[in-house]
Amino acid sequence: MSTPSEPYQSEHLASEPPRASVDAAPGRVLLEFGAPWCGHCIAAQPALQHLLAGRDGVRHVKVEDGAGRPLGRSFRIKLGPTVVLTRGGLAQVGLVGRVSLLD
């Protein structure tokens, strides 16, 4: 899994990383599952960008999710947007659905 130059990643990855790569990543990884056409996913971006500002120790991985996508299924993702914060491959916290700066 490559390290982005900034904590916030504005585009979905062309292909999702394998679960083993996420599990082996050092430090914390914020996985964002959604789709570029999803209204709630788009609306969540300012809150996620604000959350990640100044947090160089967190990698943001934006994954387009859908039926048959193995990474999303491995975390039991059913609805977008869903964010999962992992450390050492273990989910530390997750948030499902609409997110705003007021949350």
Residue map of PLM features:
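Thiol-based oxidoreductase modules, predominantly thioredoxin-like and allied folds used
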Residues: 13, 33, 56-70
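N-terminal leader/targeting and pre-domain segments
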Residues: 1-28
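Non-catalytic, surface beta->alpha helical segment in thiol-disulfide oxidoreductase systems
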Residues: 79, 84-103
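Short pre-active-site segment immediately N-terminal to redox-active cysteine/selenocysteine motifs
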Residues: 34-37, 79
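The canonical Cys-X-X-Cys-His
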Residues: 38-41, 83
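Short hydrophobic/charged patches on amphipathic alpha-helices used for structural packing
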Residues: 19-20, 69-72
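A short glycine-leucine-enriched loop at secondary-structure breakpoints
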Residues: 74-78
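Typically the conserved alpha-helix immediately C-terminal to a functionally engaged Cys/Sec
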Residues: 40-54
